[in-house]
A protein has these predicted regions:
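The canonical Cys-X-X-Cys-His
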Residues: 1-2, 35, 70, 116-119, ...
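Sequence context surrounding c-type heme c attachment/ligation sites in exported
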Residues: 113-127, 140-145, 173-179, 194, ...
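Periplasmic/extracellular electron-transfer cofactor-ligation site
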Residues: 1-15, 42-49, 77-81, 121-157, ...
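Electron-transfer interface patches adjacent to heme c in soluble/periplasmic c-type cytochromes
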Residues: 9-36, 57-67, 143-181, 199-210
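Extended, well-folded interaction surfaces typified by the phenylalanyl-tRNA synthetase beta subunit core
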Residues: 82-92, 229
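Electrostatic cytochrome c docking/interface patches
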Residues: 94-121
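Short helix- or helix-capping micro-motifs
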Residues: 73-75
Length: 230
């Protein structure tokens, strides 16, 4: 999937995460539906569109059950009164990210390629960060996990590595190596991986889910780093 907007190789500047905890005085009528719509369709309660880096094109495939689980968790977050200010997006945003999502389901859970694709795409959006950037956004359709996405932060500049089935990708690692990188942020040589790899968030992934993600990665076409992009 691609964002229907023009991207640069760097993220649009000044995106600010919005407060999503529940103030005591807030009206809860329709909150579940509004949160689900914001997550899966990128539409705020006031009708405005949420921009990058929120991976709406991938979240559109989240199952109804998984979206509801997220909403339930968010509604249990302690109340926080905070105004982060307005986000500023340097690219034009579409009026919407396509038609409303009426309903979506996930593949049956198991150590399968299909379920791994769901986890690596819609749930964890691994394929966004590990795919090179094109003019329409991360090239997740044609250059899936071929590396090349640049991240700029306090750590400097990090380029996401190749995780296709190429020899310089996932093929050179054992399943246990890949699991350690995903859940602990440790390379086979023991070196710590750089931010923004969110391994702390993946630390509690079930073994079966990790097996599914690895099965998915190993069947992807082998692509060179950056898939030959300049």
């Amino acid at each position: 999937m691609h964002l229907p907007v023009a991207w640069s190789r760097r993220r649009p500047s000044s995106p600010r995460s919005r407060r999503i905890s529940r103030p005591q005085a807030a009206c809860l009528s329709g909150l579940t539906r509004k949160l689900a719509r914001a997550i899966r369709e990128g539409i705020r309660p006031d009708g405005s569109v949420i921009g990058p880096p929120m991976p709406i094109p991938l979240y559109r495939g989240l199952s109804d059950e998984d979206v509801m689980s997220m909403v339930i968790d968010l509604r249990q977050v302690p109340a926080v009164e905070n105004d982060p200010g307005e986000s500023r997006c340097d690219v034009p945003l579409p009026p919407s990210y396509s038609p409303p999502v009426e309903s979506a389901s996930a593949p049956d859970r198991g150590a399968t390629v299909e379920y791994g694709a769901y986890l690596a795409g819609h749930m964890a959006h691994c394929i966004e960060c590990h795919s090179p950037m094109g003019p329409q956004g991360p090239m997740t359709d044609t250059h899936t996990v071929a590396s090349g996405f640049e991240f700029h932060g306090p750590w400097g500049t990090v380029i996401s590595p190749n995780f296709s089935s190429a020899e310089d990708g996932v093929a050179e690692y054992s399943d246990e190596d890949v699991k350690a990188m995903i859940t602990q942020g440790l390379r086979p040589d023991g070196e710590r991986m750089s931010p923004p790899m969110p391994y702390a968030n993946y630390a509690r992934m079930a073994e079966e889910d990790l097996d599914a993600v690895i099965a998915y990665l190993r069947q992807l076409p082998p692509l060179p780093d950056g898939a030959g992009l300049e």
